[in-house]
Amino acid sequence: MNIEKMTTTLQEAIAEAQKVAVTRQHQEIDIAHLWKIFLQPNHFGRNFYTDAGLDVDAFEREVDNALDEYPSVAGGNVQYGQNLSQNLFHLLQEADSLREEFQDEFLSTEIVLLALMKLKNYRLTKYLMQQGITEKELRKNIEEMRGGDRVTSQNQEEQYKALEKYGVDLVQQVKAGKQDPIIGRDEEIRDVIRILSRKTKNNPVLIGEPGVGKTAIVEGLAQRIVRKDVPENLKDKTIFSLDMGALIAGAKFRGEFEERLKAVLKEVKKSDGKIILFIDEIHNIVGAGKTEGSMDAGNLLKPMLARGELHLIGATTLDEYRQYMEKDKALERRFQKVLVKEPTVEDTISILRGLKERFEIHHGVNIHDNALVAAATLSDRYITDRFLPDKAIDLVDEASATIRVEMNSMPTELDQVTRRLMQLEIEEAALKKESDDASKKRLANLQEELADLREEANSMKMQWETEKEEVNAVSNKRAEIDKAKHELEDAENNYDLERAAVLRHGTIPQLEHELKELEEKNAKDNVKMVQESVTENEIAQVVGRLTGIPVTKLVEGEREKLMKLNETLHKRVIGQDEAVDAVSDAVIRSRAGLQDPNRPLGSFLFLGPTGVGKTELAKALAEDLFDSEDHMVRIDMSEYMEKHAVSRLVGAPPGYVGYEEGGQLTEAVRRNPYTIVLLDEIEKAHPDVFNILLQVLDDGRLTDSKGRVVDFKNTVLIMTSNIGSQLLLEGVTPEGTIPEEVENQVMNILKGHFKPEFLNRIDDTILFTPLSLDNVKGIIGKMTAQLAHRLEQQEIVLEITDEAKTWIAENGYEPAYGARPLKRFITREVETPLAKEIVSGRVMPKTKVTISLLDNQLVFENEPIEEV
């Protein structure tokens, strides 16, 4: 018997049977060893017997019994499983005769299974005949399975029932109730039906952005076929979704993938138009399985597509269609394009309403309608890099999952009581060991408190368990209704009118009445520990978590924080009232939801001399809004002085180094859409930079080098500049105000430097005034407070007299340079001498240092702090 003339599956089975013989210490490989392998899960042999109507588990037990009765041999040099038994040799000879009768080139598994029926006296054959399995019946099954084909390939078993192996029957899935309902998309489904009804080129390809519902359209068509809501020519059709991954996986040798695909196509062709093939991500067939000298999957499909023998629906995204399909013109022209557009917000709300029931049943929660509306509107506005309805469905799913997790977790109140109980029990155990009166008294009080707490914990636990049971009861009732509705659909499709009438007028109304009673009973309980409702607030929290943009309703603490934003900024930025007011007002407008949804939250141009707080205000705002001054996108425009550096903002163009990295501005905002963008020293940048900023200021959007639109609608744009600072320094009044004449002069210089279309798009141009003496004193107070804070860590208290502060202000401040020289002056005159005192040991921990003025010089006096 030539093993080379066997199919791969049979060769592998014999090799595995030898391993069984070795494990069981049997000298020969018998029929039972081989059948042990044939009956393994997912093996061709097991599936073959299952289709013949045999109880395979009982047959497997019979095979095990036969193996147990086989004699095992023990010894030092015994060779196990090296020979075939007389029975197995005889079986393979019978199988070879059958192979010649069937005119096969290779001996396949099903022929060996049939050959067993020839050995009438063998134990397993007798068992099969007792179970009603006959040679005639098995032969008929083989002929049906082969459909007139001969075995010409070593992988023949893989090609039987290829569609079942490598595809999913969508129509069957709908009948089994495994698919969510498809709402809308009627126009696209009609287009698909029309193209499928053509004589030739009857292959639609659905093209659209990821997440717009291309696969859903095919599922919608499957649902219509089940409901018989299609033209006559499609009523008896079935849709198979081809799994390209399963088709390619495990194809080890050249040509194996093509054989599998040919087997699938052969089955489709044999069905005479009854099977519609659906390939998701159809661009994968271009080049799939392509190796040197072999054809790719696309070329195997072309002849059948052209002749109309294959009904194929494809789905792919716009980018991949352009990249793969359009390159292969011959393949592209065999398809008819159906463009799937993103649904509107209104359509998305309808889709969500249709899916609501499925989500409620799956998660066991109650989803409010306002949550669905919020999911559609908020995802459309804030999640800009994905598409409806996918992103809205994700929000509802995520919010429902959050509530479900909370429902299954212990409520906070009960958790607190349980932890307190544990704490007191530990204390009780410790006090029991003490014998003094105070401890006994404390123990008595503690035991009293423990008794009360235990009672409270038990009642809360009972309430929680009851509420959970009530929620689960509602969830189970919803699932029952869903099952009954599915049964009703089945009954109507099969014209079982009596069953349909019982369900429609009896079972379903009864279940709905019971559900209503349960919901009303739940609604009466005012105080609830379990939150089971998904509202718009939960959706808003999910949006905030995904994007970092706060869209939840204002809570009390945040209201106070926003109303005090002005004061907080003033504490850090001293003297610039107009600028602080303008920025804080923009933030308040945005959180109240009143700002223009198509523009940034605010765009400001800060003008003024150096060192008066322009950049500091941006940092202060970042710290107040995001609790960290690093939480802002800071771009120093002095780095963008050359024309070619402009591309760094939006990314290098294709073909240039760094194309994959994206732009510094666009990438930062894409990852963090709610932020402050600070463009420092903007007048230093090349004029072309301002052209890039035009659409940011006007529409709140910017397209990067890869064509992705980055959303700037939730950013505060702050630009700083020193233009006209000399005029501001010279023209400021003693009171610290800027005369109108000086303001006009500065504006004229500004108009000369920036184009009108740039200035026209900025919300507010704010002039920062040079600092007055009072402002400078305030800044000195702030700087010395920071120094005092650093000294506190060394247990040194710092005090500075008003005269000393005035002297520092008069000597350290230069109007032309703003507050920055003050920092250097304080370092030189205060920090350095103080550091020397500490290092020399004259100032020790637990010391108070007072800085005062004497003979126009700062003097340091130190005294020990008395311990209280």
Swiss-Prot record:
> Mostly located where?
cytoplasm
- Pfam families on file: AAA, AAA_2, AAA_lid_9, Clp_N, ClpB_D2-small
One GO MF annotation is: ATP hydrolysis activity
**Residues annotated as domain Clp R:** 3-148
Region described as NBD1: spans on this chain: 161-342
Region named C-terminal: 771-868
Question: What ranges does the record give for the region Repeat 2, renumbered to this chain?
Answer: 84-148
Q: Where in the cell is it found?
A: Cytoplasm
| Gene Ontology CC | cytoplasm
Give residues annotated as binding ATP 2: G608, P609, T610, G611, V612, G613, K614, T615
Q: Where is this region: Repeat 1?
A: 6-70
Q: Which domain of life is it from?
A: Bacteria
Q: Where does ATP 1 bind?
A: G208, E209, P210, G211, V212, G213, K214, T215
Q: Which UniProt keywords apply?
A: ATP-binding, Chaperone, Coiled coil, Cytoplasm, Nucleotide-binding, Repeat, Stress response
Write out the domain note. The Clp repeat (R) domain probably functions as a substrate-discriminating domain, recruiting aggregated proteins to the ClpB hexamer and/or stabilizing bound proteins. The NBD2 domain is responsible for oligomerization, whereas the NBD1 domain stabilizes the hexamer probably in an ATP-dependent manner. The movement of the coiled-coil domain is essential for ClpB ability to rescue proteins from an aggregated state, probably by pulling apart large aggregated proteins, which are bound between the coiled-coils motifs of adjacent ClpB subunits in the functional hexamer.
Quaternary context: Homohexamer. The oligomerization is ATP-dependent.
What family, per the record? Belongs to the ClpA/ClpB family.
Q: Give the protein's recorded name.
A: Chaperone protein ClpB
Q: What's the source species for this entry?
A: Enterococcus faecalis (strain ATCC 700802 / V583)
Report the gene name: clpB
